[in-house]
Amino acid sequence: MRLICMRKFNSHSIPIRLNLLFSIVILLFMTIIGRLLYMQVLNKDFYEKKLASASQTKITSSSARGEIYDASGKPLVENTLKQVVSFTRSNKMTATDLKETAKKLLTYVSISSPNLTERQLADYYLADPEIYKKTVEALPSEKRLDSDGNRLSESELYNNAVDSVQTSQLNYTEDEKKEIYLFSQLNAVGNFATGTIATDPLNDSQVAVIASISKEMPGISISTSWDRKVLETSLSSIVGSVSSEKAGLPAEEAEAYLKKGYSLNDRVGTSYLEKQYEETLQGKRSVKEIHLDKYGNMESVDTIEEGSKGNNIKLTIDLAFQDSVDALLKSYFNSELENGGAKYSEGVYAVALNPKTGAVLSMSGIKHDLKTGELTPDSLGTVTNVFVPGSVVKAATISSGWENGVLSGNQTLTDQSIVFQGSAPINSWYTQAYGSFPITAVQALEYSSNTYMVQTALGLMGQTYQPNMFVGTSNLESAMEKLRSTFGEYGLGTATGIDLPDESTGFVPKEYSFANYITNAFGQFDNYTPMQLAQYVATIANNGVRVAPRIVEGIYGNNDKEGLGDLIQQLQPTEINKVNISDSDMSILHQGFYQVAHGTSGLTTGRAFSNGALVSISGKTGTAESYVADGQQATNTNAVAYAPSDNPQIAVAVVFPHNTNLTNGVGPSIARDIINLYQKYHPMN
């Protein structure tokens, strides 16, 4: 009876279970259908993009850089185009595949003298799977396993295998080394990346053959590359350099470049103009799309965005004028060498600016090798070398007196021998002959008075000069800050804002004495670059408005021959600051600078500016005392000037350091001749 009941129960329960099972199956099907509906209808675009991203990838490659031209359109740097072997690597290529490709490629290209490292030889040796396996198996356990007995990562194993390879195992023939040279380059290209393979220059027949059989060597093709050639000019040193494809992005700047869309092997400017205008000169990248089949193999490569050459830059400097200034400096320097005055001099430097726009008209330098006597162009030295300026900075000292309420207008002070308690007297160059007498600010510039500057510097310390006075130095630091602050308004001891990286801001010591402070007032302590001195005098010429010097006039496109095309962007002047003195005080400086060149007093210091000048010149002389190797006394014979006096269109600074011919004030003559040259090339109104 019980058995019969059980059978009845079981027969009734089977349909219930089947119904439950069918319900679950139907529910699962509904879920799947709902999910498919969500994927294929509601979120179709998302999944189509995801599928596409899994079956295709994009790669970019750089194009030729823009070029650099002088103000007249003459090239300073050019691209030399060439046909090269390119390699695009798929993610399926093994070391064995790369070895086979290198072997085939070597039959079509020439390799003169491969320069290989032991690491490259070891990489090639271990590219054989059997050799690599045996090498790893032969490693001691601590080189294969970690402390827990687990196998080390593949990268650690590989490095240990490389370290274990003996030099005797790397004995290859010259032909094999050529193959290894190609293999190393192929192996350095990342998955889905494209790299240039270095070979000897390809001839037309090699290009044609490689292009025709490229299908036999997966990833190999012919493309156009370029070499950067800096032409031999007097401006070569400021052009800068570009990294090679092998070097790629500088390590210290790689992260910043990658964020901008660069690739690791992109060639970029690494110094001076090439670096400053990197984004302008860099070509537009080409974009290619690699399509993969369902197995992940490269199926096709499509160009979706063509690359193009970068934009060009044209300088403010006319190479003809620059070369003439260089020749002028060299002539003066050779003359001083002949009379013995320049034996210990490092060279001579000059900068010419447009005071209103900041355009650099020339930045010339002649470098003197003290060991060999060789003279070489050194335009870069105008922004990297620093010198003691001498009296040319006295207008800035007077300005500091005005700014801080120590001087008032064309104030008269007594030019006299300055004697502090326990120290030697400080004199102007004429004090012993003429004694004490009153002079104005204009005359202090015209005569180049040291003692006027010393009394101004004392005033910044809150003290008035008395003979044999004791000087308290409690205000020394604040006084130096005031003086240097005014100097900085003129561009002295601070960045000029020039469009070149790594300019020197001068040598401005943090440690100094009272004597250093006093002599700094007449230009005998802090050191400045010729460019800073040029900006200083340009600021005076421009009524106190300091404008950043700039070497680049504008950005230009390319013509149909990839040369200098139409103007894209005219670069505008950048005003940095205005010197904090009144217009009437600035006119006093103008009067003083004019009198330096045109004054009729027996104490006038700069008549050489105007003797033979083609236009009216205003300026300031400067002599900084120094000593050379054998203890012989020397001077830095410096000068700053602008012209025409009533409508300045050029401002010039000249530095001639360590001239032992103490009676030859050659600086003003050089400045005058530079202005005369400019008048001939670019007549001024």
Where are the language model's segments positioned?
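Gram-negative outer-membrane assembly/targeting C-terminal domains
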Residues: Q679-N685
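A short acidic/glycine-rich loop-to-helix N-cap element
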Residues: P657-G667
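Short, basic/aromatic recognition patches
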Residues: E48-T60, F321-K343
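Beta-lactam-recognizing serine transpeptidase/beta-lactamase-like catalytic domain environment
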Residues: P75-V77, Q83, H291-E306, I317, ...
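Active-site His/Glu-centered metal-binding helix of metallohydrolases
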Residues: L37, V392, A396
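Membrane-proximal periplasmic segments of bacterial cell-envelope enzymes
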Residues: R2-E279, R285-M298, E305, H368, ...
